[in-house]
């Protein structure tokens, strides 16, 4: 099913801004289990310089994200965004977006069947993130975040949502239900122009993008429905691209040790996957994942070369990806780590983080980057078999990339 997005009305102030990329700059912080920077991959340049004194590598990343180096934008468009589904990713999205003073998106509506009071409460108080350091309040059919009013609607049928009446540009589809073109396309039938799915897309008619890897391929005219892939694909794809470019990947196997998710059962109960039917709090649960194969959607040279499984474990957040691969080029541990360190400081700064400390999962909670290389665990067997271990905050880091992809879409708005 193909959809053609109508030309959107420009709704914005008439300011112009020179934009650049910066790895991790603090815009706002929330208080919780630890202080965390809320960062934007696309940020205003420092005064006095089009590039703000940052490296050529950062400028190169800017080129990939926006398609323009040191470009002065005309009327800055605030595209109108609605969120369908206000669960873990939906609420993380709001926190990430609220921390960006330069966002070209304006969240104006949330579809949540739990109601205004619950939506407001769960946004403010979070067992993983801690209390949101923002002014959050509930009205009759709205919530307010730092003075910005967001309408709350409640309808399980996307065709009946008020996207046309509210002039919605982008729907962030965060239910995990409408992940194919016919399902996500219902938002467009209801009046939205574009759909951004916060899960792997299924079937044809959906563009898959991983920021830092292939977001330069996004085209406003070509894609009406896009997917931000999965959190695990966002972890794997950046470092697999680096290793494939540097050493030439022949084949590989991945295991992700993944925190439990809302799709599992707290206590034993029915589920289509009999392993996921067992208590998430008590078991290591082996299950399937398409994350490894999906890497090929954004790194085509890896098509048919990767596969893997997931082990769901009794932790609420932060996961770790273990990839063993055969490569063409003979190498050694220090060379592998050197390539990953170089990427983390250069072209993939803000996407790959490099760690040489003996840390555990809780230490990575709230990390903005998509992947954290645990360099002490890198191994090379013989001279052509590599093992790389990478952590990722499967909620927060992923949600940062959803916001980033939304910004990529917004900056091409017509």
Swiss-Prot record:
GO terms for biological process: glucose metabolic process; reductive pentose-phosphate cycle. Pathway: Carbohydrate biosynthesis; Calvin cycle. It holds the Pfam family Gp_dh_C. SUPFAM superfamilies: Glyceraldehyde-3-phosphate dehydrogenase-like, C-terminal domain, NAD(P)-binding Rossmann-fold domains. The active site is at residue 231. Keywords: Calvin cycle, Chloroplast, NADP, Oxidoreductase, Plastid, Transit peptide. Its main location: plastid. Homotetramer. This is Glyceraldehyde-3-phosphate dehydrogenase, chloroplastic. It comes from Chondrus crispus (Carrageen Irish moss).
């Amino acid at each position: 099913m193909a959809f053609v997005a109508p030309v959107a009305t420009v709704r914005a102030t008439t300011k112009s801004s020179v934009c650049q990329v910066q790895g991790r700059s603090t815009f706002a912080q929330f208080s919780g289990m630890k202080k965390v920077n809320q960062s934007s991959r696309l940020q205003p340049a420092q005064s006095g310089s089009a590039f703000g004194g940052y490296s050529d590598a950062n400028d190169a990343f800017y080129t990939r994200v926006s398609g323009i180096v040191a470009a002065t934008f005309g009327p800055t468009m605030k595209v109108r965004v609605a969120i369908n589904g206000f669960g873990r990713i939906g609420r993380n999205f709001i926190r990430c977006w609220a921390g960006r003073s330069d966002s070209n998106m304006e969240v104006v509506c949330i579809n949540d069947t739990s109601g205004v009071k619950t939506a407001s409460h769960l946004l403010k108080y979070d067992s993983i993130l801690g209390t949101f350091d923002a002014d959050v309040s509930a009205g009759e059919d709205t919530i307010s975040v730092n003075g910005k009013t967001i309408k709350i609607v409640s309808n399980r049928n996307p065709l009946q949502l008020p996207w046309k009446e509210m002039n919605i540009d982008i729907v962030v589809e965060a239910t995990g239900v409408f992940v194919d073109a016919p399902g996500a396309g219902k938002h467009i039938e209801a009046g939205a122009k574009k759909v951004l799915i916060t899960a792997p897309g299924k079937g044809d008619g959906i563009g898959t993008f991983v920021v830092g890897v292939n977001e330069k391929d996004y085209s406003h005219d070509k894609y009406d429905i896009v997917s931000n892939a999965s959190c695990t694909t966002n972890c794997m794809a950046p470092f697999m691209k680096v290793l494939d470019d540097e050493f030439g990947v022949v084949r590989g196997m991945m295991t992700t040790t993944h925190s439990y998710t809302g799709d599992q059962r707290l206590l034993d109960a029915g589920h289509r996957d009999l392993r996921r039917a067992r208590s998430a709090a008590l078991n290591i649960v082996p299950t399937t994942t398409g994350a490894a194969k999906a890497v090929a959607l954004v790194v085509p040279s890896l098509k048919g070369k990767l596969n893997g499984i997931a082990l769901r474990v009794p932790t609420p957040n932060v996961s770790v990806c273990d990839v063993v691969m055969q490569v063409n080029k003979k190498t050694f541990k220090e060379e592998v780590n050197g390539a990953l360190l170089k990427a983390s400081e250069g072209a993939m700064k803000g996407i790959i983080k490099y760690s040489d400390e003996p840390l555990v999962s809780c230490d990575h909670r709230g990390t903005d980057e998509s992947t954290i290389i645990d360099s002490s665990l890198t191994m090379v067997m013989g001279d052509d078999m590599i093992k790389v271990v990478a952590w990722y905050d499967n909620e927060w880091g992923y949600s940062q990339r959803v916001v980033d992809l939304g910004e990529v879409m917004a900056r091409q708005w017509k």
